[in-house]
Amino acid sequence: GEIRFVETKFLSKLDNEIANNFREVVFEDKVYFNKTKINTQINFKMAKFKNNVEFVNLHNNVSFNNVNFKGIVNFENLNINTLNFKNVIFNNIVSFDNIRFDNNCKPNFENCTFSDQFNIEHKYIEYKFDEIEKTQEYDKLLNYRDLFRKLKSNRIAHHNLIDASELRAQELYARELELKHKENKSLKEKIERWQLVFYRKLCDHHTDLLLNLKWLVVVIGLFALLYFASRMIQDISLLKALNQYGVCLSIVGVFNLLCLYWFGCIKKFDFFVYLNLIVVLWVICYMPKIIFGIVNIIGDKSYNGFENALITIYTILLALVLFSLQKTARKNSIVPS
C-alpha cells in the first residue's frame, strides 16, 4: 500500500552503524515524505519507485543513485544543501516546486534520463561559461555536455524553444572546454574549438543580440579608423575637411567615456564599443559607402597594398558578423528540429 513518512526523524550520523539507507528498496505504491528530519543524508541507491513519489519540506542532503522512477515525482518546498541524482531514470513527469539551495548550489544530475516533462526553475539548470570553466576534469565536462543535451531535447519536445536555445549554448560551452582539456586533439578538433570560442565571444552562440550588435560597431569602427589613418598618412590635409563642431563633440564624448570607465560605470569592452560608435557616426556622416567594404575594391579609386588587405579582411569579418546577426535575430532558428 501507500507509504508515508510524515515528520519522521532519521537520526543516524556518519559514524553510526545504522544508516539512512533505502538501498535496492522497491516501492510498489505511492511514497510520501513530508517534514522529514535527516541528520546527515538519505540514500536511495538502486531503489525503484513504481508509482508517484512526493518529497515535501525536506531540509537536508538527499542522494539518488541508480534509481528508477516509474510514476510522477514531485519535490516541493525543499531547503537543502545538496540534491544528487546519478544514473537516474525519470519515466514520468518530474516537478521541482519552491526549492531553495544553501550557498547558491544547484541540483546535480549525472547520466540521468528524462522521458517526460521536467519542470524546474531555469536558474537551477542554468550555467554560465565561468561556472563550467571551473571544472578541469575531462569526464565531468562530458557529463555536463550530456546533461545539457538531454535537457535541451526535453525542452524542444515540450516546445520550450527559448530555454532550449540557452541549453544549446551551455552544451557548446561544455564542448569547447572538453576540447580544451582533451589530449592529442586532431586538426579538425582544434579548428572546432576555436570556432566555438569565436561564436561564444561574438554572440554567445546566437543567444545575445546586443553582444552581436556591439561587435558589428567594433568591426566597422576599427576598419574606418585604420582606413582613415592610412589616408591621413598620405595626405595630412584631410584633417582640415573635418567639421570642427564634430571634432569638439567627439573629444567631449571620449572624455566622458574615460571618466565613466575610470569610475567603473562601464566595463572595458563597452568602453571600447562606445569609442568605435563615435567613429561609426563619423563614417555615416562623411563616407557611408565604405561600410560595404568590397564596393571600394571594384571602384575607380586606387588603393595601396595595406588598404586592399584591410578592405578584404574587413569584408570577410563584416560578412561573418552580419550572418551571425541575422541568425541571432531569429533566435529560435538555432534550435535543431
Question: What are these regions, as identified by a protein language model?
Answer:
Residues G1-S337:
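Terminal module of membrane-associated proteins
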